[in-house]
Swiss-Prot record:
Lineage: superkingdom: Eukaryota
Gene source species: Dictyostelium discoideum (Social amoeba)
Protein name: Small ribosomal subunit protein uS10
GO MF annotation, one: structural constituent of ribosome
Keyword field: Ribonucleoprotein, Ribosomal protein
Gene Ontology, cellular component aspect: cytosolic small ribosomal subunit; extracellular matrix
Swiss-Prot/TrEMBL GO biological process terms: translation
Positions of transmembrane segments: none
Family indicated by similarity: Belongs to the universal ribosomal protein uS10 family.
Amino acid sequence: MSMNPIKKTEETVAAPAVNKISITLTSRNPKSLEKVCADIITLAKNKKVKAKGPIRIPNKVLKITTRKSPCGEGTNTWDRFEMRIHKRVIHILSTQDFVKEMNTISIEAGVDVEVIMDKKEAKN
């Protein structure tokens, strides 16, 4: 009893490749950072794309302590300066077209954007 293999005559249409897009946003100003994150998330919701985030990464606090007196004489007084760097990550499952649409978002000054695209692996 051997079974004849079934031949598929229908051609399968290739679906657009789904990519995993990781967007990393960094800034010293948390308000402008949150505004850009909100713009990206609303664009993803309007395009009906799966989005996770913004994931808040712990802040980096860079500190520098210097002497106030330039000559080194006098009372030992010190200035303490610090800079806080805020970071957010957004993960999106989408096609390449979403990245083109994302270019229309206005990014405020001082916000750095890093986009990493990976192919989503198909499950067997």
